[in-house]
Amino acid sequence: MIANYQQPGAAIDYTNSTGDTIKAGQVVSLTTRIGIAGTEIPAAAVGSLHVKGVFTMDKASGAIALGAAVYYNASTDKITTASSSAVPAGWAIAAAKSEDTTVQVCIG
């Protein structure tokens, strides 16, 4: 097989099929991972979705250790360490205390 280089892969073109506008910075579930909207993406339009990088995201209660695998819970719109009913998001690049409201996540 021959593989042809396409792009660095830090962002992808994403067709918004949600029926609603996706806001810039909004987390988008890609079933087995997440992306972050780089710009506002109107319904049925194509826009940029970051799939690599470090992002500060809202987190659920509870401490998160440096290096912990983290997940996106769409029902709460928060990052958690609980994998049940959640989408893999990446890993925590810094520890977050239980009382912290955000965590730094490396996606991709």
Predicted regions and their residues:
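Surface-exposed, low-hydrophobicity beta-strand/loop segments enriched in small/polar/acidic residues
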Residues: 1-108
